Amino acid sequence: FATKKKQQVAISDSDSTRVFTKVPIHNHWESMELDEKNPKTLGWLQVAYWNESKKMVSNDVCASVIGFLKQKVLMDESSKIENVHLRCAYVNDEIYYDLGIRGWKFVKISANGINFVDYGIDSPFFTRTNKTGIQTIPNLRPDGNALDELVKLIKVPNPEMFKVHLISMFVDGLPMPCFAIRGHAGSAKSSTSSMIKRIVDPSGNSNDSNLKSFPHGEDNFVVSLSGSYLSAFENISHIDKTTTNMLCRAITGGAFEKRGQYTNGDVFSINIKRKILINGIDFQIKESDLLDRTIQYNLERIPKEQRLSEKKIEKIFQKLLPDILGEIFLILQKVLKIIDSVEDSLPHTERMSDFTIFGEAIYQSMGHKEGEFSKLYDSELKTYLQNLHDSNPIVKFCEEILGDNDEIEMTAEQVFKKISEIASRENYSDGGLPKSANGVRAWVD
């Protein structure tokens, strides 16, 4: 019975231990994971069997059947391996967006138009998690300029870059920079972060349901990312090298280890590429690899006379949201018309090349001239590097050691001695200075 019901079975290309299938439910199609521990899959099989046979079967029987079907697929060398999408898919020059509603309705964007479509046998494979919330139905005939109204509402300091960055989040499968939002109390960083999440990949209607704490350890990080297309991490205070490495791999796509379900020591590899947002009061991004993979937004504290209540902000946002989505989708339709020619016209870049290409196409589709986005993006990156340079205390010491020279050859021990002499003379006690010659070597590395 279960074998007849399942259609288009596929192994996930990002996690070779997971198997998905498409099944008919009432008058539409859905994807199910063949997992004997998944309550939704168990419930589907029990109800489907009852509807045809009027017989009840236990959870144990259903779990055995589903487990058998899964292993059969995994052991069959002819089984298809496919990308199983979450919320968004960019396939064959078309963008699919899962609205998260019952009945599995999607928005399909192509160069020729935008349509509301049903999920079906010919659709790309999608899955949903308990974090896949319902999205507002977009208004494809938006009134006014909703994106401009949004940036006024959140008072973002670099609005043109923000709009391009936000729209790029709907392009699945390609690395796009992380949102890095800083702001003290009263700057609305949490509200801003929640609105971004709710525009792209809502998990609910409140800040609490859309924002989460950064997880401890790589295993928890992978689990946290796996549940959402866009993960928004709240109140980041410090980004160490381990966190930097995990974020970089998740942004551009990389392999993470995953423990097997059994105590046999087996370790599997899971490939993760996700859209990410982080916010905090005053975290610093010190590694150039992560710096290249983020766009930073420093929100100013909003004066008391300009502050709005959460209820008022929510009312404005809810009114704007259908038009924001409609405007974004219409811009993406224009992007798909010109993306190939834009890619051919741009010089090769080593840093976030896919974002550079799509950013340029998005900016042109918003009415700007060719090449203007590349200048805007380069200016942003240079500002980040300059701020990193200015905020690093050792740089100022090295500049004094160099004096008028362009280059001096010194050992790490000699550099440490000089830094210590200058710090003592200037009564400088910043904890960011190297504590030894090895500290100098680590800083250089």
Spans of model-derived segments:
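Conserved AAA+/SF3 P-loop NTPase catalytic/coupling segment centered on the Walker-B
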Residues: 229-251, 283-292
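P-loop NTPase catalytic core of nucleic-acid-dependent motor ATPases
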Residues: 113-227
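Conserved catalytic/switch belt of AAA+ P-loop NTPases
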Residues: 201, 244-268
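Short beta-alpha connecting loops at secondary-structure transitions
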Residues: 231-234, 306-317
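A short helix-turn-beta junction within AAA+ P-loop NTPase domains corresponding to the substrate/partner-engaging
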Residues: 286-304
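AAA+/SF3 P-loop NTPase mechanochemical coupling elements
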Residues: 221-224, 260-278
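DNA transaction DNA-binding modules
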Residues: 5-26, 30, 37-40, 44, ...
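N-terminal nucleic-acid engagement/recognition segments and initiation subdomains in replication
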Residues: 1-141, 145, 223, 330, ...
